[in-house]
């Protein structure tokens, strides 16, 4: 990882952890202790590979035979989160992964309650859906469809000109994305 990426990721870590430090319940008790936050700050964070392009973030056990914990996990984030328009959302994704790191494996009620501590959670969901759509577009295959006879050619690139015709019947071809459902967030 080059210096620039390293800086971006450590800044993000710092931002998220300093927000987590101020989350308190109605008795003014903190949700995340200093010790937990210290452990979280030591977790390796890097970028997702192209194979997991449709995910926003992913937490995995380092040792698959042991339970998920701050000392037994690593976090990967989608590189697209570091485009300026997604920067605030990136904090939310890392927060989500940090909740997993603390041993909350599934998205159960307790998990969602912690997740809801994040400010502007609704806005985060909206931006999240926008990112999902963008990632789906990148992954989509394209179908050149003949408007006259219905003939379909699949293409992996969106490169297309509006004046393409089907050789056999001379119908005009249209370019339609084939969108597959993305894997669940985790
Ligand atoms: Zn045709
Ligand atoms: Zn998750």
What do the PLM-derived regions correspond to, one by one?
Residues 6-84, 88, 105-186:
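Metalloprotease/metallohydrolase-associated module, dominated by Zn2+-dependent proteases
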Residues 92-104:
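Active-site recognition of the HExxH zinc-binding catalytic motif
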């Amino acid at each position: 990882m080059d210096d620039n990426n390293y800086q971006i990721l450590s800044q993000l870590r710092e931002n998220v952890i300093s927000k987590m430090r101020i989350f308190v319940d109605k008795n003014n008790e903190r949700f995340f202790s200093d010790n937990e936050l210290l452990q979280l700050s030591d977790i390796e964070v890097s970028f997702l590979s192209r194979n997991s392009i449709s995910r926003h973030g992913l937490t995995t056990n380092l040792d698959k035979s042991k339970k998920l914990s701050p000392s037994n996990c690593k976090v990967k984030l989608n590189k697209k989160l570091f485009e300026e328009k997604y920067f605030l959302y990136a904090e939310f994704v890392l927060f989500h992964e940090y909740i997993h790191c603390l041993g909350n494996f599934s998205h159960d009620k307790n998990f969602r309650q912690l997740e809801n501590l994040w400010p502007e959670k609704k806005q985060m969901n909206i931006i999240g859906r926008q990112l999902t759509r963008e990632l789906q577009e990148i992954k989509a295959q394209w179908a050149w469809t003949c408007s006259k006879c219905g003939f379909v050619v699949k293409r992996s690139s969106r490169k297309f000109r509006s004046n393409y015709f089907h050789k056999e019947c001379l119908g005009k071809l249209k370019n339609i994305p084939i969108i597959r459902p993305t894997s669940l967030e985790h």
